[in-house]
Amino acid sequence: MIKSNRITACALAALFAGASFSASAWWGGPGYGNGLWDNMGDMFGDGYGDFNMSMGGGGRGYGRGYGRGNGYGYGAPYGYGAPYGYGAPYGYGAPYGYGAPYGAMPYGAMPPQMPAAPAQPQAAPSR
């Protein structure tokens, strides 16, 4: 009798276990794919996704200028200051400035300067 009760108990346990497993799979509990936990997940924090920090931008502009010259820059014929660009003939502050044929003036040398104007006597302050 005890042996038959054990066999019956084991058979009932297997029957209930099988029924619960099939019910979980049929009704779609967590992990079975019916979307029951789509919004909360299993709350273990082991999700997946795609992340990208690329960004871009652009802009548009519109404006009007004061067209001077013949299309090559400000002033004729080819840029700021004739004939070839910034401060003819060779660049800013010719002959040794920016764009000079062999570079700027060596260190320690002073560029040529205008002589100082004579000092004017200062007028006495009025009372």
UniProtKB/Swiss-Prot annotation:
Family: To C.vinosum CV2 and T.roseopersicina TR0.
Signal peptide extent: 1-25
Subunit structure: The protein envelope of the sulfur globules is composed of the three different proteins CV1, CV2 and CV3.
Highest taxon in the source lineage: Bacteria
Pfam families: SGP
Protein function: Structural protein of the sulfur globules, which are intracellular globules that serve for sulfur storage in purple sulfur bacteria.
Name of this chain's protein: Sulfur globule protein CV1
Organism taxonomic ancestry: Bacteria, Pseudomonadati, Pseudomonadota, Gammaproteobacteria, Chromatiales
Swiss-Prot/TrEMBL keywords: Signal
Statement: the UniProt record of this protein carries the keyword Signal: yes
Entry annotated with the keyword Cytoplasm: no
